[in-house]
Amino acid sequence: MTARPAVRQPAGLPCPQPCNRYGYPMTNALLAEIDALVAGTHHNPHALLGAHPGPEGVWVRALRPLARSVHVLLANGSRVELPHLHKGVFAGVVPGAEVPDYRLVVRYDDGTELTVDDPYRHLPTLGELDIHLIQEGRHEELWRVLGAHTKRFPSVLGDTEGTAFTVWAPNARGVRVIGDFNHWDGTGHPMRSLGSCGVWELFIPGVGDGTRYKYQVLGADGVWREKADPVAFATQAPPETASVVFTSRYTWQDDEWLTQRAAADLHRKPMSIYEVHLGSWRPGLSYRELADQLVDYVRELGFTHVEFLPVAEHPFGGSWGYQVTSYYAPTARFGSPDDFRYLVDRLHQAGIGVFLDWVPAHFPKDDWALSRFDGTALYEHPDPRRGIHPDWDTLIFNYGRTEVRNFLVANALFWLEEFHIDGLRVDAVASMLYLDYSRESGQWEPNAYGGRENLDAIDFLRELNATAYRRNPGIAMIAEESTAWPGVTRSTDTGGLGFGFKWNMGWMHDTLSYLQHDPVHRQYHHNEVTFSMVYAYSENYVLPLSHDEVVHGKRSLLYKMPGNEWQRCANLRALLAYMWAHPGKQLLFMGNEIAQGDEWSHDAGVQWWLLRYPHHAGMRRLVADLNRLYRNTRALWSQDTVPEGFTWLDGGDASGNTLSFLRWGDDGSVLACLVNFSGRPHPERRVGLPYAGRWREILNTDAVLYGGSGVSQPGIIEASEETPWQGQPASALVTYPPLGVSWLVFDGT
């Protein structure tokens, strides 16, 4: 590279140190400032660079490490040369008392000349209120101020367009922006610290949507790290790891859905959820292609909601999305963030709600992501007894740090408000609540009161739920909580965690355990299939048959069942109909609706080819009918959370492997559910019924169209008050189909 022109010293002025062309000495302090600037350790580069009024005029200093020459271009077209001072810093005086609008004309050794705006002439893009709220950990719209935001500023020389980069790194010794725009060399783009709030900021003109970027962070430990933006709105597709500048331009069309949602009480509405892993439902589809195919499929099957396994960006596909590195960016595997908005919008327009799995319990150790972000344990807890998850070898958030809690609460709001998500299923809540979760004695630290409860996590969950419900009426916050923690779905003002629903893991484990026994032996395990009603109203429950039950050697739902192919299918049909009639909402993982034989594989996807076989096509037909009948039968959902919605008829027939109960609607409607988990039919069984008159069978899982044997009720069922039975004023003789479930409704006198 050709040497830059020497700085001339005016005649007659003694200057023992290097001088600029105006004769002002290059003091040791100024040299040290420039050295710190180039080294990336200057906390306020804007104090040195940019335009600053002085006695001689307006000083303009520019950092252009690779430039041959730099001139200031003024609004009147004149140019003022900025001589090179030291290590790529150019400086000179522009006549006048006030800072003018200007641009920099930068020439390089190859003759290239560029006219660019100066990043260091711009004021901070964060206001005092934003800084205060960040410092307090109370900025509920954190994504509006952190991350990368494209901006436009008017000026005499023409509007300036660029991107404001803002990142929280309170212990960093310096932060620079790197990306496509500077050939991934951050020397020319050091950021300024905004003080004790810990935020670093820089507006870079000329950087727009689609630009890849990262932060170079000089940690408190003296180590430079290249970090993805924790609040990036878009990313490169894995395995690449850069963040991407993205501005949403999506126009939503779901106002009607949002209005109805805000007025609804999901506890008193039908809610059947189809759980989906987007990458393997039909492998190879984009968000927009899924919007065409998935929407039609879910509507055909009649589910009220879908629940997506985590969509936030994650580097390892085999984690299924549960090891998140970019909490504010939908994965780039299937398209842009606006493409994902389109998928949600299409589902809403079809009357289908959207839940997301959300993972605040832990995050991976990837060195380019959140781990030791500023050279310290920033997002993670510094004590490994609280900061490392022993099951997954991941890091645990420091819930006691207000800024970290703010990051997570704002992230939940981001998905709910920016993507119109209808609720979040919070993953691994139990691992957050207990300090000794998966830890042996001596591997965990008690709380301040000597207990094992994680008090910081409890406070975080309460804040999360209270804030989410306050800002977004009609949503659902759902806990995957596998213990008997009290009050998970109780309101925060009465001491609860504030969730709207909780997965009923006990029902799932007990029911699957019962059904895996041969029918001959089920009589000895009858309590497993009845115990759920002992605590059914202790929380607001979702009954989950989720992805977790069909992986890691647990076998598919179909192959958990005993017997030959017909018996397995019959058992599974009975399970689903029993589940849909049991108090609580329902969740079914994709593939289970067609009785998939293999365990789920995120690489292979759903075994759609099985639908050519009658048993599998019949299972899908049954699920569609279950959802149709469920939505149209108030007794199955309007009193899910109160004991008045359920009455046992007979829960004690262990030897016959049968159950019978009533479900009541808030309008007085009633449904009788007859369950037979034995392999033989039970004809001419007397069952108690609340009303005398005609009863009609609306569902029989043993029907031929579902793949059953065709054992059904003998036409219209006449209930009579001549023989009160099972605590009911009337009764009738009915048939319990083999390995089947029958639903009866009152048809009138």
UniProtKB/Swiss-Prot annotation:
Q: Name one Pfam family in it.
A: CBM_48
Q: Pathway it belongs to?
A: Glycan biosynthesis; glycogen biosynthesis
Q: Which GO terms describe its cellular component?
A: cytosol
Catalytic site residues?
D427 (nucleophile), E480 (proton donor)
Quote the catalytic activity from the record: Transfers a segment of a (1->4)-alpha-D-glucan chain to a primary hydroxy group in a similar glucan chain
The record ties this protein, via SMART domains, to: Aamy
EC number(s) recorded for this UniProt protein: 2.4.1.18
Database matches in InterPro entries: A-amylase/branching_C, Branching_enzy, GlgB, GlgB_N, GlgB_N_E_set_prok, Glyco_hydro_13_cat_dom, Glyco_hydro_13_N, Glyco_hydro_b
GO MF annotation terms: 1,4-alpha-glucan branching enzyme activity; cation binding; hydrolase activity, hydrolyzing O-glycosyl compounds
Function statement: Catalyzes the formation of the alpha-1,6-glucosidic linkages in glycogen by scission of a 1,4-alpha-linked oligosaccharide from growing alpha-1,4-glucan chains and the subsequent attachment of the oligosaccharide to the alpha-1,6 position.
Q: Which family does this protein fall into?
A: Belongs to the glycosyl hydrolase 13 family. GlgB subfamily.
Instruction: Supply the name of the protein.
Output: 1,4-alpha-glucan branching enzyme GlgB
Gene behind the chain: glgB
